[in-house]
Amino acid sequence: APRWCSEETRMADEKKYKKPVPRIDEESKGFWEACQRHELYVQKCRACGTWRYYPRALCPACLSADTEWVLSSGRGTVYTYTVTYQNLAPGFRDELPYVLAYVELNEGVRLLTNIVGCAPQDVKIGMPVEGTFDDVTPELTLPKFKPAVS
């Protein structure tokens, strides 16, 4: 914010979400709308039964456009991960270190996401996780995962 703006305006600007945001299109709109309701939906092909993520118009297995959105269990395991200790990009450096992971949902699809709610050194491949949601702006909610409670 410019030096001449009010202290209140400067503080409001500092609280704005600074990370890149996803581009929401027709194929992904249902996914992001569900996230705003704190629900994790994934696509399933009605023709062949293939679950898929990322959202898209055609099934990668059979090329059918006959798709439905299905509520996921929100549970899965850490497929692989990395711990980021250094990132100078705005919005990221304040959260260091953070865990970026592929989570394999019980439905069989993998999402690139963050693991939260535990120390980075506690994350392990195969670790059971469950979904949680981060309302980063009034218009955007990100799905994240935390260690599963038995």
Question: Language model features by range: what are they?
Answer:
Residues 39-42, 56:
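Residues immediately within or flanking Cys/His clusters that coordinate Zn2+
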Residues 44-47, 58-64:
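Short, cysteine/histidine-rich loop/knuckle motifs that typically chelate Zn2+
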Residues 53, 66-68:
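Short functional micro-motifs and their immediate structural scaffolds
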Residues 81-86, 134-138:
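Short, conserved beta-turn/loop elements at beta-strand boundaries and strand-helix junctions
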Residues 95-111:
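Short, basic/aromatic beta-hairpin or loop at an interaction surface
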